[in-house]
Regions:
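Radical SAM enzyme [4Fe-4S]-AdoMet core and its adjacent flexible, acidic
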Residues: 13, 25, 29-51, 56, ...
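C-terminal accessory regions of radical SAM enzymes
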Residues: 266, 575-732
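Catalytic or ion-translocation cores adjacent to nucleophile or general acid/base/metal-coordination motifs
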Residues: 335, 346-350, 364-375, 454-455, ...
Length: 732
């Protein structure tokens, strides 16, 4: 025990903590007896352990799960609500006194010893445990005693929650956005007239009337370059475009962000999605969008101290990353899994159509590797040569079969740059296939079967999805299909049904028509985690031809405190809301073929929903992207800090392949940046009834959902070698 911890143990608990403690003991006489009879913390631990073991041993399935003799979805689904609590209590005892590096506190030590904290509070009135801690423990023992039950909401209730959230296709919302567009354009016209803005492409002819200027500006609205040129880069301009609707506290935070050097980049189209005149039928409906634009105090405080969440993103050329992969350089290729690697081009693709407040690459903005200096991001003359060398990595690798081109944002590259990148991918894939003809059976490499483009522009800037871009994508799809590439995927990030606008719908239709399947990766932020919000998004996306792929917990540390929704909420959403969209296995063969006929996605999804009587296709998996080991929601809650923040121990997703190096890695510890109490208080602050979320306390165990066949790689007609290329021992 460190001196600092010893000092914390002597801190008196607050009046609120005393009140919660008294309630805890009053409801649990057996616990009170253990605590009052224990002479020290060890006796308290032994007493609790023996008590709980006596209960759990009566359920062999739960006991085997606790002992880790069984695992997986089937074993998880056999657990009762009380089993969740018993396993957590035993894990608390087994991990008592463990120290963890807490990056939420910039690497300070966090210690979990909840039974000791209760004993100190009972015996001495000390331990320094906060009310958030005691509230969590109160709910835990209620769950263990059977006083706190879980009532699954009906489908009707989930659909009632969904109906609270309008989409951007609602005629009333469309009308509001038209008003916003008019206000924004009139401000831009005024600034051009005053000479505050001068541009060689966007200007007015002498003698034009105000009506003529407005009609010309309306034409500009359909031009992606207009939105990039007139993107807001300062708090004052943002407030002006939003009709001076931002309150003084928000402006103070934004001024701090500007002073700290955090980039601002909000284009006029995306700004028009924010409410200025809040309609009675959509109060709070734009919060998931607003929280992507407006920075939090925690982000500002941590900017400059943000550490890379992704251990495998820390790369030294020639040395293995955390997952064991050797990469050619530090910036352009990222890799975690055997089958897929990320390519980040040295083009405009290093920029985005806007900066998301909870961006996973905020670390790269902090160190200047990503930015919005668009002119400086144009490709240099040496890029074509470098691209060929980078694609050589994919060509020579024995297991890579999937290339994800992202950034930044893949579609921020110009049509010409993107066409050259895709031509390079085509040549690489062709060379890889040709080289296989010379290899013996059992020695053949994986060939490229999937190409993905990572982009948020269908959301941020749907004007980018032009007929010319669709032509580039369609041409590549046609010729690449002839050499064995079978899956062409646009991987995007819709965060709210309010982002699904007529412009976004038309952009997706154009992408589908080019033969590309559009999938969505939803970030489960605080506003997006409200009851029914994620399910409504799934439904609306299905209606415009998008398949749901992942629902990601917000990753990062204290910089993303504000937007973080706890992993317990992610499990709750999976078990209680998304479940009404569960796809029966009888439709698996049908849905597996959806990407082969992307042009008919809307019709095929609609037909399947009608026949299966589902409100949406729950084809996504709720996961957290873990440092080093990838996506998983397989965890157990093994600890809790005196501030009530839970400590989760994650395992690999055993349903997919991993680097052999990861088999030797320890489990991954995640200390959540906020307690359940703090999360619920945030929800209450944005108008939610916390009683709707009552079961969240009990979801202390998670299990990754199986991947549906829709997202599996096509099978080869030959056996791929077992050998791994570019694999080494990871850097410590």
């Amino acid at each position: 025990m460190t001196a600092n911890t010893h000092e914390l143990d002597r801190i008196a608990i607050t009046v609120k903590s005393h009140m919660l403690l008294r309630q805890l003991l009053r409801e649990n006489p057996a616990l009170e007896e253990i605590m009052r009879n224990a002479c020290n913390e060890t006796e308290a631990l032994v007493g609790v352990r023996n008590w709980v073991l006596g209960e759990i041993i009566e359920n062999p399935d739960a006991y085997k799960f606790y002992k880790r003799d069984v695992h997986g979805r089937e074993a998880f689904e056999k657990l009762t609500w009380k089993d969740f609590a018993a396993i957590r209590l035993l894990d608390y005892v087994d991990n008592a006194g463990r120290e963890f590096d807490d990056q939420n506190l910039r690497g300070e030590k966090a210690i979990s010893n909840p039974i000791q904290l209760i004993w100190l509070a009972v015996t001495h009135g000390t331990g320094g445990a906060k009310p958030y801690f005691f509230q969590d423990m109160l709910m835990l023992f209620r769950q263990f005693s059977g006083e706190y039950a879980r009532d699954f909401p009906t489908r009707e209730k989930v659909e009632e929650w969904m109906d609270r959230w309008p989409s951007g296709l609602d005629p009333r919302i469309i009308k509001l956005r038209e008003e916003n567009r008019e206000r924004i354009l009139k401000i831009i016209i005024d600034k051009i007239d005053k000479g505050e803005i001068k541009d060689r492409k966007f200007f007015f002819d002498p003698g034009m009337s105000q009506e003529q200027k407005y009609l010309r500006a309306l034409e500009w609205w359909n031009d992606r370059l207009f939105h990039l040129r007139f993107a807001v880069r300062s708090p004052d301009l943002l407030n002006e475009f939003l009709g001076y609707s931002l309150d003084p506290d928000t402006m103070k935070v934004l001024y701090e962000a500007e002073k700290k050097g955090i980039p601002f980049f909000v284009n006029p189209y995306y700004m028009s999605l924010l409410h200025v005149r809040v309609p009675y039928f959509a109060v709070g409906a734009d919060l998931a969008i607003r929280y992507y634009v407006v920075y939090s105090q925690q982000l500002i405080d941590e900017y400059g101290h943000i550490v890379a969440w992704e251990k495998e993103d820390r790369v030294e050329p020639g040395k293995p990353n955390a997952a064991g992969w050797i990469l050619p350089n530090e910036h352009n290729i990222h890799r975690r899994y055997p089958e897929v690697a990320i390519l980040i081009p040295d083009t405009m693709g290093r920029a985005c159509g806007g900066l998301c407040a909870s961006c996973q690459r905020m670390y790269d903005f902090q160190r200047g590797n990503l930015n919005f200096n668009l002119d400086k991001l144009k490709p240099k003359q040496t890029w074509d040569q470098k691209l060929a060398e980078l694609l050589g990595y994919f060509e020579q690798d024995s297991q890579l079969r999937d290339i994800l081109i992202t950034g930044g944002d893949a579609l921020m590259s110009s049509d010409g740059s993107l066409a050259r990148i895709l031509d390079g991918v085509y040549r690489m894939a062709l060379n890889k296939r040709d080289a296989n003809e010379k290899r013996a059976p059992g020695e053949k490499h994986a060939e490229i079967v999937r190409v993905r483009l990572g982009t948020r522009l269908p959301v941020y800037l749907p004007q980018r999805i032009t007929p010319e871009l669709a032509q580039v994508l369609g041409d590549f799809k046609r010729k690449a299909s002839e050499i064995g590439i079978r899956q062409f995927i646009i991987q995007t990030h819709f965060e709210s049904p309010m982002e699904v606008t007529p412009e976004a719908r038309d952009a997706v239709k154009r992408l589908n028509a080019a033969g590309w399947t559009v999938t969505n990766q939803h970030v489960f932020s605080i506003a997006a985690s409200r009851r029914g919000h994620a399910s409504k998004l799934r439904k609306v996306l299905n209606e415009i031809g998008i398949l749901n792929y992942y629902t990601f917990s917000v990753k990062g540390y204290m910089e993303n405190y504000f937007n973080f929704a706890t992993n317990e909420r992610a499990v709750q959403e999976q078990m209680e809301e998304k479940v009404i969209g569960t796809i029966d296995e009888e439709y698996y063969d049908e849905i597996r073929e959806f990407p082969s006929n992307a042009e008919m996605l809307v019709e095929n999804i609609t037909s399947l929903l009608k026949r299966s009587k589902l409100p949406f296709l729950g084809s996504d998996r709720n996961v957290l992207n873990l440092p080093g080991v990838g996506k998983s929601l397989t965890f157990r809650t093994i600890g809790i800090t005196r501030y009530g923040r839970r400590i989760l121990e994650f395992e690999l997703d055993h349903t997919r392949n991993h680097s052999p190096v990861l088999e030797k890695m320890d489990k991954v510890i995640i200390i959540e940046s906020k307690s359940i109490s703090e999360y619920l208080r945030q929800l209450e602050d944005i108008g939610e009834e916390t009683s709707d979320y009552e079961s969240i306390w009990g979801y202390s165990i998670g299990e990754t959902e199986p991947r549906i066949p829709l997202y599996e790689y096509p099978e080869y007609e030959y056996e791929v070698t077992d050998e791994f290329s570019n694999l080494g021992v990871p850097v410590a």
